[in-house]
């Protein structure tokens, strides 16, 4: 998710970028990117999506276990009878160029949630959010002066449960406040410090004005909305 806000207080528009975070098997960098491959690799009319990552040896390996891969692509079961035979296969070993023809490949070089800072001259730079914001995917962001000290604060929430069993649930975000200190600096305040505590899968966050109060409304996947008063 993306939220525009003047993060550093210099009068131009910056952005808060919610991303997948760093608490997962996907550790993408410019030197070792991660890829999403989308295509009909066995030419049966069904489209498959495969995530792969570059590892320390410089090769690109699929981030999919053999059982899951062969359910989508039965040819894998025939080609690699044993799990140990599949274990060390790179993406190029598994799929020939002919099988990859017509597929779409997209690359990412970071999964960090970040600030995108505008220098006012048409240039932008990424600054990673504090490590506490990297524990789980960020799906909801709001910016405002929530503690009424005249400085911009940022609320973050998210999580994602619908992952494969071997990946586990991404549920380590209970609600986070980045308390503004001015000039783009923020202090991390956990839910136990602020009372802004939310469980489940937040998918959006909205500010609602009511009288003299501001309410933060959290929309959740397969759950009722949650409301906080500031």
Name these PLM-found stretches.
Residues 1-230:
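Beta-propeller-forming repeat regions
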